[in-house]
């Protein structure tokens, strides 16, 4: 897949998976995200780009309430998953995170076997009635993480013994094991070498057949390669959102053009 593949592809009209309406995020008195409105489409890769500190990772963490773990963080506005408010008091954040999975910047396999890393979520959420069903989920997830062939003969070896790229693909397999609807990725390739990065990017393109994928990246080349939609954040504002090809070749806002051409960053 080259830089222009995702940019040049025609995006079919997709239904909205996540809708954010008037979202603001505060860390104490600091206003980190300012009145963001955006719709994330189903079975589409959406990239969040922008300079360091622009708010893209903060907003990403709003989408599965990871910011709940920060005492001084306050979120206002509405974020709807399939039309349901994820910040409703009746929503269980643990269950939400099974629906909206997360892959972090640094690979973080649990100090468990490869098998138990992937089986952890299905066990917690009661997704398997017996060992045979759990085995099936683990294999299916490792295949979706594009790592099954590399680990199928050592499933009981520690996940931490894998290479960095393998660990990140294991974390992706772990995230999809609970059958999420959305997969969030916060700089998933920043700690990986170019070969491992290419493998993860190829995997992201495959994952969108089954999931909505939202990726935060500092690499504009990566955003161009893997995404169909791109959102540009600057100083806590969502400056521009649209088809990736348009954002990179014909942006409407001068701030977007300045970032794309390297004049701000």
From Swiss-Prot:
The protein's matches in PROSITE patterns, at most eight in alphabetical order, are given as: ABC_TRANSPORTER_1, ABC_TRANSPORTER_2, PSTB
This enzyme's EC code(s)? 7.3.2.1
Q: Cross-referenced InterPro entries, in alphabetical order?
A: AAA+_ATPase (IPR003593), ABC_transporter-like_ATP-bd (IPR003439), ABC_transporter-like_CS (IPR017871), P-loop_NTPase (IPR027417), PstB-like (IPR005670)
* Membrane topology per record: Peripheral membrane protein
**Annotated compartments:** Cell inner membrane
Q: Which Pfam families match?
A: ABC_tran
Q: Name one GO cellular component term.
A: plasma membrane
The UniProt keywords, alphabetically, are: ATP-binding, Cell inner membrane, Cell membrane, Membrane, Nucleotide-binding, Phosphate transport, Translocase, Transport
Entry keyword annotation includes Translocase: yes
Binding positions for ATP per the UniProt entry: 50-57
Q: GO molecular-function annotation terms?
A: ATP binding; ATP hydrolysis activity; ATPase-coupled phosphate ion transmembrane transporter activity
Q: State what this protein does.
A: Part of the ABC transporter complex PstSACB involved in phosphate import. Responsible for energy coupling to the transport system.
Assigned protein family: Belongs to the ABC transporter superfamily. Phosphate importer (TC 3.A.1.7) family.
Q: How does it assemble?
A: The complex is composed of two ATP-binding proteins (PstB), two transmembrane proteins (PstC and PstA) and a solute-binding protein (PstS).
Q: What is this protein called?
A: Phosphate import ATP-binding protein PstB
What species is given as this protein's source? Answer: Ruegeria sp. (strain TM1040) (Silicibacter sp.)
Organism lineage? Bacteria, Pseudomonadati, Pseudomonadota, Alphaproteobacteria, Rhodobacterales
């Amino acid at each position: 897949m080259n830089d222009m593949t995702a940019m040049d592809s025609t995006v079919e009209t997709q239904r909205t998976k996540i809708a954010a309406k008037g979202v603001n995020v505060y860390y104490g008195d600091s206003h980190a995200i300012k009145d963001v409105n955006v719709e994330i489409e189903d079975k589409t890769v959406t990239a969040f780009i922008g300079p360091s500190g622009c708010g893209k990772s903060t907003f990403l963490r709003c989408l599965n309430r990871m910011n709940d773990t920060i005492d001084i963080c306050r979120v206002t506005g509405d974020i709807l998953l399939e039309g349901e408010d994820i910040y409703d008091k009746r929503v269980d954040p643990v269950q939400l995170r099974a629906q909206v999975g997360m892959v972090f910047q640094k690979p973080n396999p649990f100090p468990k076997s490869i098998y138990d890393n992937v089986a952890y979520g299905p066990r917690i959420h009661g997704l398997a009635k017996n060992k045979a069903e759990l085995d099936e989920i683990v294999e299916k997830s490792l295949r979706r993480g594009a790592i099954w062939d590399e680990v199928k003969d050592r499933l009981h070896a520690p996940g931490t013994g894998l290479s960095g790229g393998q660990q990140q693909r294991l974390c992706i397999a772990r995230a999809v094991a609970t059958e999420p609807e959305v997969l969030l990725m916060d700089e998933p390739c920043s700690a990986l070498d170019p070969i491992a990065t290419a493998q993860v990017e190829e995997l992201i393109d495959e994952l969108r057949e089954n999931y909505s994928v939202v990726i935060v990246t500092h690499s504009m080349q990566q955003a161009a390669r893997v995404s169909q939609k791109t959102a540009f954040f600057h100083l806590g504002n969502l400056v521009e959102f649209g088809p990736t090809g348009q954002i990179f070749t014909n942006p409407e806002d001068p701030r977007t053009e300045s970032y794309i051409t390297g004049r701000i960053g």
